Amino acid sequence: MIPRRSLLPMLVASLAGLSRFSVGADLQQFPTSELTIVSASGSHRFKVELAKTPAQMTQGLMFRTSLAPDAGMLFEYQQPTAATMWMRNTLIPLDMLFVDAQGRIVNIHERAVPQSLDVIGAAEPVRAVIELNGGTAARLGIEPGDRVIHPIFGNTS
């Protein structure tokens, strides 16, 4: 058992660590790009923020309270990798689309639960993960096998 007196300094230190994110001092800036997802229901354009650096990937969409309907984040890996995600400090539900090196969606995890520490991944290596508002994939009919058009996949047409 930890004495109550020792809990106060730990609590203050923990809150101090969290507060640096709330003031934006250490929050990453993200470049933006557009991508298109081609599905049986049509072509769907999104303006995405690009997470390329380890710091950007670590932060992702943490601490956001909303996301525009046509917005998202693209996590770009230099080589196909067994990417795993979680929802720590993420305040909104997200759909996670796992995309192979050819731009094909290989797995979709729909409506990931905010703040969950469950590990989410794909069964095969991916070149990218796209995070969209929770429910977007179902609403637009986006499914595994659909194509993502973006320069990182070499298929901009």
Features from the language model and the residues they span:
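N-terminal export signals
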Residues: 6-24
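Positively charged n-region of N-terminal signal peptides that target proteins for export
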Residues: 1-5
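Compact, glycine-rich, soluble single-domain proteins
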Residues: 25-157
